[in-house]
Amino acid sequence: MPLDGLHTASTRMMLDCTSLREALAALNTSLGYLRSPLADDPGVRDQFRAASIQAFEFTYELAFKFMKRQLEQMLPVPALVDEMTFMQVVRSAAEAGLVTDATRFHAYREARNITSHSYDRAKAERILVELPRFADDVEYLVARLEERNRVAD
């Protein structure tokens, strides 16, 4: 029975990436609406922008948690992950092949901090430009997590 994104298979805890995949799908849906003719109406565009930013924030938080969870699975002393800084976690994830570019995740963190502390339309528009690449990077992360946590037949 799943417990907080984990389930057992043999003696090893396996990550269940469903919540991250669903968050990513919500982000992609929001971005799709933002690119649609519906967004030609400024009021509707504002709502789609807000939905996209919110989906980004949620997906970002989950992506980082899943990086940490996977590293805990890989390290001989899982508690070491809790002592790592953000950049140590992201660099370790890159070294493990979970993400392709640690510096991009640092930029996503900065974008997340901007969106969580104040709402500024111009800043939100700048962040929107980065969201398709963010979605691609999270898709890569999910694929790597699913590869590592596939239950053997």
Name these PLM-found stretches.
Residues 2-153:
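Solvent-exposed interaction patches of small proteins and small membrane subunits
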